[in-house]
Amino acid sequence: MPRWLVWSVLLPLGGALAAHAGDKGGPAVGDIAPDFKSWDAVTHERIHLSEQTGKVVVLTFWASWCAPCRREIPVLDRLQSKVSKDQLVVYAVPFQAPDQAYGPLVKIFRSLKVTLVEDRYGSIAGRYRIDSLPHLFLIGRDGRIAAEHKGYGEGSIPELVADVNAALGPAPAPAPADNPPPAEH
């Protein structure tokens, strides 16, 4: 490979790394979650994170080649199945090369309640500074990061469920009936 070609690739990369050298890393608990726009890879519906304010969002970064990630997705699917999408949305952002086809993932996610978010060029993963997989952010109703989980194991499920329950808060009061029963004396 010609030396000029190597340097033409390494110099910009080195500059980008140096620019981020002093950064604290990704967003932290309490920070406003970095916004993104994308689409659901299965339904092709637009997704705009900031439009989810008022809902709890589980945002997980994963890869099909990552064994813990493959174990985490069914757990998140069961979680989404138990809570209405009016209250909670679960987004799975695949971490893969831009040229990898989404077709096999779409086939898997068609049968799941979890939303497969397209991130072909890694821009969403870049905003969150993903450095390990799976990497999950729990975003509260106010748009702030309520919890962060790196890695996955069976022992992490209770903590994740507790964090989601805390973010959801107490169950909302039931809507008043159209014809309330008469008061008893």
Residue ranges, per PLM feature:
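Positively charged n-region of N-terminal signal peptides that target proteins for export
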Residues: 1-4
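Hydrophobic beta-strand core positions in alpha/beta domains
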Residues: 60, 92, 137-138
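Structural microenvironment flanking redox-active thiols in thiol-disulfide oxidoreductases
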Residues: 70-109, 120-126, 162
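A short beta-strand-turn-helix
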Residues: 36-57
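Thiol/disulfide oxidoreductase modules built on the thioredoxin-like
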Residues: 106-112, 119-165
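N-proximal helix/coil linker or "cap" segments that precede and/or mark the start of modular domains
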Residues: 15-35, 170-185
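Bacterial N-terminal signal peptides
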Residues: 7-16
